[in-house]
């Protein structure tokens, strides 16, 4: 089951996406569909077919966001989180081979588009890291076996 938590930044991005889709993009595509429909035969009208499909995709996303945003719990930074890994943390980890990774633990719906360096709170890596501290060793189950990582740093975006 997906966790229904989101960072303030993630919530604002999804709200902005919903506003854009509903107020700007959908009306634009609706106009194109109307124009293409006015040309007559719709069976071989590529503009009509393409824009109608695009309109369905927009409507699907708008329905999802309209339902999701009121139900989601926004998780803001709290000073009690300092020093431990919790939701919203930026975590840098390293394995014995010297491979270093840095990512932020966020809700599953925040991982889209240009969201680089984010992992879902529902992922095995995030689950293994929760409540750990700097210099702790973490064992993460993977398809190829258990992987060991060491926590180098934990940071939070405090300006949320």
UniProtKB/Swiss-Prot annotation:
Classification via Gene3D superfamilies: Transcription elongation factor, GreA/GreB, C-terminal domain (3.10.50.30), Transcription elongation factor, GreA/GreB, N-terminal domain (1.10.287.180)
PROSITE patterns in the cross-refs: GREAB_1, GREAB_2
UniProt keyword list: DNA-binding, Transcription, Transcription regulation
Annotated signal peptide: none
Stored InterPro entries: GreA/GreB_C_sf (IPR036953), TF_GreA/GreB_CS (IPR018151), Tscrpt_elong_fac_GreA/B (IPR028624), Tscrpt_elong_fac_GreA/B_C (IPR001437), Tscrpt_elong_fac_GreA/B_fam (IPR023459), Tscrpt_elong_fac_GreA/B_N (IPR022691), Tscrpt_elong_fac_GreA/B_N_sf (IPR036805), Tscrpt_elong_fac_GreB (IPR006358)
GO molecular function, one term: DNA binding
Record-stated family: Belongs to the GreA/GreB family. GreB subfamily.
Function of the protein: Necessary for efficient RNA polymerase transcription elongation past template-encoded arresting sites. The arresting sites in DNA have the property of trapping a certain fraction of elongating RNA polymerases that pass through, resulting in locked ternary complexes. Cleavage of the nascent transcript by cleavage factors such as GreA or GreB allows the resumption of elongation from the new 3'terminus. GreB releases sequences of up to 9 nucleotides in length.
The protein's name: Transcription elongation factor GreB
Natural source organism: Vibrio vulnificus (strain YJ016)
């Amino acid at each position: 089951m997906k966790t229904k938590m989101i960072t303030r930044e993630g919530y604002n991005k999804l709200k902005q996406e919903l506003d854009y889709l509903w107020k700007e993009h959908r009306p634009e595509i609706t106009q194109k569909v109307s124009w293409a429909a006015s040309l007559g035969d719709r069976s071989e009208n590529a503009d009509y077919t393409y824009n109608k499909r695009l309109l369905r995709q927009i409507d699907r996303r708008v329905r999802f966001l309209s339902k999701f945003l009121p139900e989601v719990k926004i998780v803001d930074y709290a000073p009690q989180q300092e020093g431990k890994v919790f939701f919203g943390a930026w975590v840098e980890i390293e394995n014995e081979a010297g491979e270093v990774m840095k990512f932020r633990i966020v809700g599953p719906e925040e991982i889209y588009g240009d969201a680089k360096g984010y992992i879902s709170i529902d992922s095995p890596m995030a689950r293994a890291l929760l409540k750990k501290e700097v210099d702790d060793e973490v064992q993460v189950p993977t398809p190829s076996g258990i992987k060991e990582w060491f926590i180098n740093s934990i940071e939070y975006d405090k300006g949320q």
